[in-house]
Amino acid sequence: MHLYLIGIGSNQPHPVIGTPNRIIPQAVAALEMDDIDVFAHSATIQSSPMGPSSRRFANAAAVVATELEPPALLARLHDIESHFGRVRRGQSWRARVLDLDILLWSGGMWAGSKPELSIPHPGLRSRSFVLTPAAMVAPDWRDPVSGLNIRHLQSRFNRAKALDQSPHHH
C-alpha cells in the first residue's frame, strides 16, 4: 500500500458545481474510489494566481492510500480532472476547473520516463499555496530532496513574510 500527498487546486467555476470553493470538496469526494482511500484532507485556502491569470485559486491537499504506482495514479488524477471539465493544453498557469498533482509519496523520489511525473512535485518547496494545506494533513512528511518536513518548509514562508512586513528603520 502506498500513501500519496495530493495537491488540489481550482480557479475557474464549474457550470454545475459552481465556484472553486465548491469544486474542492467535490474533487476530494471524486478521489475516493474502490482502490483509492482518502485518509485525510485539508481545509480549503485561498491564494493569488500565478502568471497573468487574474482568478484567485482555491487550494487544498489530501492524503490517499492505494496500491497504484505513480504513473497509474497520475492517469487516474487526469481522468478526474477531465471529468470536471479540465482541458490540458496551453500554459500551465491558465485558469482551470481542477488541478490534481502528486506532491509526495511514501516511496520517496520518482523520476519516470514522462516529464509530467516527478516526485516530489517540482513546485513543492517553492509554493506556499501548496505547503499550507499540505501542512494541515501531512506536517511530518519529509521532502526527500531537502530532507525537511512539510511543516519546516511551510514555516520558511511564514518567517519570510513576517520579515517583509516589519517596519524598516534607517
Predicted regions and their residues:
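Short, well-structured hydrophobic secondary-structure segments
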Residues: 32, 63-69, 73
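Small-molecule pocket liners
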Residues: 4, 60, 127-128
